[in-house]
Amino acid sequence: MRHAARVEIHGAFWNGYSGGWVGRLLHAINIPMNAAFIRDPALRERYLTWWQTLPLSDAEKEALATHLTAYIQKLSLNNSPDLLIWNTCQMMTTHFIQHENWIPESEISALEDGDVIPFESLPDTLEIVGKQAAKHLAVLKLNGGLGTTMGCSGPKSLIHVHLNDTFIDIISKQMHTLRQQTGHAIPLILLNSFNTSDATLAHLSDMPFLELFQHEVPRIDTETGKPYVCHRDKNLEWYPPGHGDLYLSLLTSGMLDTLIQKGIGYLFVSNADNLGATTHLKLLGHMHEKKIPFMMEVTPKTLTDIKGGTLIRHQNRVCLLERAQVAPEFLDTFEDLARFTVFNTNSVWINLDILKQRLTQGPLKLPVIVNPKQVHGTHVVQLEQALGAAIEAFNGAVAITVPRDRFVPVKTTSDLMLLQSDYYTKRLDGSLQPASQRGLPTVILSKEFSNVSAYQQRVVYPPSLKHCDYLRLDGDITLLDRVKFEGHVHLHVPPAQHVVLENKTFKNCRVRVDKHGQLHEDPWVPDST
């Protein structure tokens, strides 16, 4: 049996708890589309209502039912819970009807006044409210990623980012500080994948936490439309359907009920690689005082964020719009900073009691993101859902604009250099503070720095960037101790040459390297890059 959504307990949070979803094998082989796979009568009735109201003819429904049968069979044989099968059918039906799942530009409008609350408008008294409400809080970190974009084969959260501390080590310090600050044993939950679990557990052997696994669903063979088959490695037939699966995983694993039974009513969720996403008690206080069901943190969009998800108005609701939901001819508009001014940090706050009530009606009907992939030469499709898309599923959900220092992602080695540099002051409690008010520097590294291993060989000591606005490094360059970049700097090393930098300051210049390896600094000229 493969990984089902389940809970593992590491440490002494809730001794004696034997939670976890016990899988069952459904006896519904060759299932017609009659909801035979759903055992709960009330849930089956809701499923049938959903099916009957689909905007399809009888012939189209028959074709769709035939198409879905193979997936229902495969999920059933994998002991998948009813709600996951329903949600998979729901995603595939959306894909069947819309195919590309793009939102027409004509249906999109910008946010209106009042759609987003400025963090600065929240009164300081909410800190006290949040501290009192902290006994009802749990913190969850999304820890399923391998960091493949940086050539990392292990969990991204185990990359060293400051001295000997990894992301997870710093998160552990942040949680320790939070517990001391509030006086409550706030649980830490890690949403792991089968790719990250073992390495994470080995690293965190001394820290108590809860482990939650996502569901997995079958990949779609693009050519046949059937579940993808891989004879080399059956694991490659499956994938986790995006962070939007968290909501169902919480329910079917048993964790949602257990948290509620333990008096936990709020869950703060963020990416493990975003060390700026500490638990801010003022935000918790606002959620508690206003009885908000769902709250998303957004931040002002910059040129570096133009590909990130943004908030829009669609069908009179505030919705999340991801790049994958945008037609190619609309991408320029999507990236227009004047029209779409904020983007999603993927940090959300969830009222667990309201989530439970909502899920008793069936899975959240979240937008579907089509993610094309290639596995061993076969073109496949993954249907995914975004965590933040749930903002449209809750009446009374809000977005709040937070300071930029609450969003410190690491997607590339350029991000890693910025995080490791002195641009951020790393406090003992694990929090980060920009050392300068200059704004976020732009850092561009060439292919020689593109993977973590090569980066670590070249960046022996992180450079000083606290007075930097723009840095571009091209070529085979090694950074040793006491290297500073200030203002705008572009250093280009020709092929077949290697430059070692140590105890050197570069300020507002373009650096050339001659055939003898000597550096020559020319004054910075705009657009000289």
Identify the function of each model-found stretch.
Residues 198-361:
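Conserved core of the sugar-phosphate nucleotidyltransferase
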Residues 132-134, 181-185, 259-264:
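Short helix-terminating capping/connector loops at secondary-structure junctions
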Residues 152-158, 203-204:
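"Short basic amphipathic alpha-helical interaction patches in structured regions
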Residues 139-143, 165-177, 246-258, 387:
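Structured alpha-helical segments in the cores of large, soluble enzyme domains
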Residues 188-193, 297:
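Short internal beta-strands
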Residues 2-135, 285-529:
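Left-handed beta-helix
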Residues 156-169, 176, 180, 190, ...:
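Metallocofactor- and cofactor-centric catalytic cores in central/energy metabolism, strongly enriched
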Residues 130-153:
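N-terminal nucleotide-binding beta1-loop-alpha1 segment
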